[in-house]
From Swiss-Prot:
Gene3D superfamilies: 1.10.10.350, HUPs. Zn(2+) binds at residues 98, 100, 125, 127. One of its GO terms (molecular function) is zinc ion binding. Signal peptide: none annotated. ATP binds at residue 239. This is Glutamate--tRNA ligase. GO terms for biological process: glutamyl-tRNA aminoacylation. It comes from Shewanella sediminis (strain HAW-EB3).
C-alpha cells in the first residue's frame, strides 16, 4: 500500500512555524517511504477563511520547497460529496436529525455542570423518528455508547478512550453546511490518506473521527500527534513571542534550508547531529523518533543554522535568494560585482540575508559620508601619504586583479616602511566608508577600479580638510 500523507491548513491566517513543522513532518514521512503528499485547504469556516490567507499558505509551502503530489483540494468545493455521505448515514441510521433548540442545549449543559457531570449532548433526539416539520435541525453522528476507541499513535503510544465519554457529534449545521470533524473524515477516506500527522490539539478529535470512519466502513489511518512549540518562557508560542508567518522569515533574511533544518530538529533528532540536508532528512526521518514533549523556539539556534547555510550553500543559489533582499532594500545591482561574488566575500559574518544585503551596499552605490568612528580613527593626517601612494600604484595596474591589488598595497607598506595595517585600514575606510569589510584586496577588487579611484580621492580630500581645520 502506498504511503499517503496530507497537510490540511485552515486559511484563517498565515502559515506559522507550528503549521510549517507539521507540514514538514508529514512531507518527510511521505518522501521517506516513497509515498505521496497531499495539500488540502480546510476552508469550511467561511466567515474567517480568506483568499489572502490561502495564498499566504501556498506561498509559504512553495518557498519552503514542500511540494505536493495532489491538490490543493478545497473543502468548500466538496460540499456535494459531504452531503451525499450524510444522506447515506441518515438512511443507514448512523446519523440523525436533532431538533433541540440552542436554549435547551445551554440549559442541559448548565445542569450537567451544576452536578459536576461531563457536559455532552444527552441523546434526546437520538432514537426519535424524523419530524415532518419546518423546525430547524442539526445532524448528529450516532456515536457508539459501548466499548472504546483504541489507536496507536506514532508519538504518544497507545491511546484508549471510552465511547461513553464521547458526544454525538454535530456533522451538519442548521443551515446545512457540514462541520470540520466530518469533512476531515470524508476527505481522508476519499483521498486515501494512510497516515495523519497533526498537532496535539487535534488529539481529542481523533476517537470521534475514528468512530465515523468505522461507521462508513472506511480504513483507519495511522496517527501522529505532534507536541506544541513553546516560547522561551514556557508558554505556547504566539505573536507576543515574535512568532510570525513563514514568509516573514524570508523577509527577515532566512534561507528555507535553515528554517527547515531548524524545524525538523524542533522535536525530532538523530543522535547528536544538528545539521541536516533535505536528502538526509528524507533518509533518516521516522515518526516514531519524534519527542512527545513540547519544544522551545530558540532564535539564536536558528540564526546559527542560517549563518551556516549562507556560508556552506552554493553562492549562486544563495545569490538567488539575496536578489529579493537587494530589491527590497532598493539596491541596484546592475552596476557592480556579481551577487554570488558578494555572497562569497560577506558570508563569513552575515547571520541573515537581510544583513548581507545591507552590508553590500558600498559595492553598488557611493556613500555620502564616512562612518564617524572609523574616519576619526583611520582618516587622520598620517593616512595622507599611504593613501596618495597606494592610489598611484593602483592607478598604474594594467589589469585589475586580486594579486595586483595585493601587491600594490604591500609595495606601499614596504616603501613607507610601515605595517600593512597602516595602509590597509585607511584604504578600507576610504573605499567602503566603514571600518569593517572582507579582506581589503578582495574588497577593492569587487568595488572596481574606477570607484576605488574616486573614493580614495574623496578620502584624501577628507584628510586634507581635517589637517587644515
Amino acid at each position: 500500500m502506498t504511503t499517503k500523507t496530507r497537510f490540511a491548513p485552515s486559511p484563517t491566517g498565515f502559515l506559522h512555524v507550528g503549521g510549517a513543522r507539521t507540514a514538514l513532518y508529514s512531507w518527510l514521512y511521505a518522501r521517506a517511504n516513497q509515498g505521496e503528499f497531499v495539500l488540502r485547504v480546510e476552508d469550511t469556516d467561511i466567515e474567517r477563511s480568506t483568499p489572502e490567507a490561502c495564498e499566504a499558505i501556498l506561498e509559504g509551502m512553495q518557498w519552503l520547497g514542500l511540494n505536493w503530489d495532489e491538490g490543493p483540494y478545497y473543502q468548500t468545493k466538496r460540499f456535494d460529496r459531504y452531503n451525499e455521505i450524510i444522506a447515506q448515514m441518515l438512511e443507514q441510521g448512523t446519523a440523525y436529525k436533532c431538533y433541540c433548540s440552542r436554549e435547551r442545549i445551554e440549559t442541559m449543559r448548565d445542569e450537567q455542570a451544576a452536578k459536576g457531570e461531563q457536559q455532552k449532548y444527552d441523546g434526546c433526539c437520538r432514537d426519535k423518528a424524523p419530524r415532518d416539520t419546518d423546525e430547524p435541525f442539526v445532524i448528529r453522528f450516532k456515536n457508539p455508547t459501548e466499548g472504546s476507541v483504541v489507536f496507536d499513535d506514532h508519538v504518544r503510544g497507545r491511546i484508549e478512550i471510552s465511547n461513553d465519554l464521547l458526544d454525538d457529534l454535530i456533522i451538519a449545521r442548521t443551515e446545512g453546511t457540514p462541520t470540520y470533524n466530518f469533512c476531515v473524515v470524508v476527505d481522508d477516506w476519499d483521498m486515501g490518506i494512510t497516515c495523519v500527522v497533526r498537532g496535539e490539539d487535534h488529539i481529542n478529535n481523533t476517537p470521534r473521527q475514528i468512530n465515523i470512519l468505522k461507521a462508513l466502513g472506511a480504513p483507519i489511518p495511522e496517527y501522529a500527534h505532534v507536541a506544541m512549540i513553546l516560547g522561551d518562557d514556557g508558554a505556547k508560542l504566539s505573536k507576543r513571542h515574535g512568532a510570525v508567518g513563514v514568509m516573514q522569515y524570508r523577509d527577515d533574511g532566512y534561507l528555507p534550508e535553515a528554517l527547515l533544518n531548524y524545524l525538523v530538529r524542533l522535536g525530532w533528532s538523530h543522535g547528536d547531529q544538528e545539521v541536516f540536508s533535505i536528502d538526509e532528512m528524507k533518509q533518516l526521518f521516522k515518526l516514531d523518533d519524534i519527542n512527545k514533549a513540547a519544544s522551545a523556539f530558540n532564535t539564536e539556534k536558528l540564526n546559527w543554522l542560517n549563518q551556516h547555510y549562507i556560508k556552506e550553500l552554493d553562492p549562486e543559489y544563495v545569490a538567488k535568494h539575496l536578489e529579493w533582499h537587494m530589491a527590497d532594500q532598493k539596491i541596484d545591482t546592475s552596476n557592480g560585482p556579481a551577487l554570488s561574488a558578494v555572497v562569497t566575500a560577506l558570508s563569513e559574518r552575515a547571520k541573515t540575508l537581510k544583513e548581507l544585503a545591507a552590508s553590500s551596499r558600498y559595492f553598488y552605490e557611493d556613500f555620502a559620508e564616512f562612518d564617524a568612528t572609523a574616519a576619526k580613527k583611520h582618516l587622520r593626517g598620517v593616512a595622507m601619504e599611504p593613501l596618495e601612494l597606494v592610489q598611484k600604484k593602483l592607478a598604474e595596474l594594467s589589469e585589475w586583479t586580486l594579486e595586483g591589488i595585493h601587491q600594490a598595497i604591500e609595495d606601499t607598506a614596504t616603501e613607507l616602511e610601515v605595517g600593512m595595517g597602516k595602509v590597509g585600514m585607511p584604504l578600507r575606510v576610504a573605499v567602503t566608508g566603514a571600518g569593517m569589510s572582507p579582506a581589503v584586496d578582495l574588497t577593492l577588487f569587487l568595488v572596481g577600479k574606477a570607484r576605488c579611484e574616486q573614493r580614495i580621492s574623496k578620502a584624501i580630500e577628507f584628510v586634507a580638510n581635517r589637517i587644515n581645520s
